[in-house]
């Protein structure tokens, strides 16, 4: 928003359609980074969908969007359109799918941190899998009802991983 007029300057939606409950309410870190030898005022976020985003907070330009966990619902984010490229594994409209991350997300309410001296962002990440039974109800606005869904199906609890990842903010790589 423009602080003087209140008008919308730009917006970005990390999970268009959001058929997996990947809300993006996780906090946003503001930073000044040098990207491609150019100083940029950026915002960084690791929402539930498994991608770490770096966006120019002045222009709204998507600078990077890389996986921080092995998400299966999308292969990558198309940097020209800014949209995630959904995979067949992520489409649960016709058959039950096991999808990573589950609705709990790859990163939830746990705070992430950044270190301006090293350029690293630290993300407390999870890798839960979720069972999504077939439904097309989620595709119809206002038609969703609660249903039984499961997370971490068939995964040995000893192998359920929570990890703190250190990601280089300038590149999005971990």
Question: What are the roles of these predicted feature ranges?
Answer:
Residues 22-47, 108-113, 118-125:
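Repeat-blade elements of multi-bladed beta-propeller folds
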Residues 13, 44, 101:
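Glycine- and other small-residue-rich loops at beta-strand/loop junctions that grip anionic moieties
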Residues 1-24, 31-39, 51-98, 129-174:
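Extracytoplasmic/lumenal domain signature
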């Amino acid at each position: 928003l423009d602080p003087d007029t209140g008008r919308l300057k730009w917006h970005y939606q990390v999970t268009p359609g959001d058929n997996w409950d990947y809300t993006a309410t996780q906090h946003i870190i503001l930073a000044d980074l040098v990207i491609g030898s150019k100083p940029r005022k950026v915002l960084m976020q690791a929402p539930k969908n498994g991608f770490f985003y770096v966006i120019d907070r002045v222009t709204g330009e998507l600078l990077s969007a890389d996986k921080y966990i092995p998400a299966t619902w999308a292969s990558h984010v198309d940097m020209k359109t800014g949209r995630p490229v959904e995979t067949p594994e992520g489409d649960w409209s016709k058959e039950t799918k096991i999808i990573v991350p589950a609705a709990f997300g790859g990163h939830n309410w746990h705070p992430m941190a950044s270190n301006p001296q090293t350029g690293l962002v630290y993300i407390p990440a999870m890798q839960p899998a979720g069972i999504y039974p077939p439904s097309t109800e989620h595709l119809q606005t206002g038609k969703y009802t609660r249903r039984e869904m499961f997370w971490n199906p068939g995964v040995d609890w000893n192998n359920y991983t929570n990890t703190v990842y250190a990601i280089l903010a300038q590149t999005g790589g971990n």
